[in-house]
Amino acid sequence: MTTVPCFIAGLPKAELHLHIEGTLEPAMMLRLAERNRQPPPFPDVETAEKAYRFTNLQSFLDIYYRSTEVLVTEEDFYDLTLAYLEKAASQKIGHAEIFFDPQAHTVRGIAFATVLRGMEEACREAHSRLGISTRLIMCILRHLSEQEGMTMLNEAVRWKRWITGIGLDSSERGNPPSKFHNLYREARREGFFLTAHAGEEGSAASVKETLDLLHVDRIDHGVRCMDDPALVKELVRRAVPLTVCPLSNVKLQVFGSMQEHNLKAMLEKGLMVTLNSDDPAYFGGYLNDNFTAAAEALDLSFSDIIRLAANSFNASMLSIVQKKIHLLELADYARGFAPGH
């Protein structure tokens, strides 16, 4: 009988919750620091890996922002993005929607265009050479002011041919969705696809407020929605996608272990859940690792796994025609395997 990891390895899928800065592996971090003649955040790979032990979201963010300082040139952002897309293609990811945090770079004097041009060149090459499609989502850092976010939104409008979505990330506590109500209203007026992190370290109320005030197309994380049955029913009724990141949730102690994760319960409630790797260089695994860890710990069936993959395409920004092409490929792949597990 086909093993779950083997089935997942060949499974056509999309990734919708991936921070490009979170793919900065320690070896690349050290290489870029040397290339840019900067002191490295850590002296060696081993020290960096030991530092990747987090107690909560903020302990991760402290290291995350420190590490991004090695990203300076257009070439750096190109190398970082292409490395992820090559990894993604090797894991049968046919489409990726990639977050980037320009405020983490512009505050250091790096031009917005430097970040975007490097990323876009890598996306074009990956599409041509590997066949993987991409969309870019500019994230606003929620620990900064809405006015600072508006400055970034104005930049995004200028680069709308490359940026298709607006997101909201960084520390959820003390930075409610209402803080960015005006920004999201303007982003919606400009025609951007809207998503936001909610219900990771925040409560179910944060998810509800994100839906009601920001009018997002998708919720990133959202696992705390399960604490509010009425909210769950509303999410199911509206078919709002939730981009869940299991290894991230365990690494940041949202759940004590993978066995305690509520992913399977979310599926059983009929929520449109997708699986994602979030910041794989820091959380111990890329997308296939997340699928495998969740499947084995939660005893997911083959039909559960196929449903998660189908959700990833249905929840994406792809056109209806593009979604159908991917879903047909997924159906053809699944047809060759037994439905049971």
Curated annotation (Swiss-Prot):
Pfam families in the record: A_deaminase (PF00962)
Gene Ontology biological process terms from the UniProt entry: adenine catabolic process; hypoxanthine salvage; nucleotide metabolic process
Catalytic activity as recorded in UniProt: adenine + H2O + H(+) = hypoxanthine + NH4(+)
EC number: 3.5.4.2
Residues annotated as the enzyme's active site: E200
Annotated binding of Zn(2+), by residue: H17, H19, H197, D278
Enzyme class, first EC level, given as a word: hydrolase
Example of a GO cellular component annotation carried by this entry: cytosol
Cofactor annotation comment: Binds 1 zinc ion per subunit.
UniProt cofactor(s): Zn(2+)
A molecular function GO annotation: zinc ion binding
InterPro entries: A_deaminase_dom, ADE, Ado/ade_deaminase, Metal_Hydrolase
Site (Important for catalytic activity): H221
UniProt cross-references to CDD domains, sorted A to Z: ADA
UniProt keyword terms in alphabetical order: Hydrolase, Metal-binding, Nucleotide metabolism, Zinc
SUPFAM superfamilies for this protein: Metallo-dependent hydrolases
Residues reported to bind substrate: D279
Function: Catalyzes the hydrolytic deamination of adenine to hypoxanthine. Plays an important role in the purine salvage pathway and in nitrogen catabolism.
Family, per entry: Belongs to the metallo-dependent hydrolases superfamily. Adenosine and AMP deaminases family. Adenine deaminase type 2 subfamily.
Protein name per UniProt: Adenine deaminase
Species per Swiss-Prot/TrEMBL record: Chlorobium luteolum (strain DSM 273 / BCRC 81028 / 2530) (Pelodictyon luteolum)
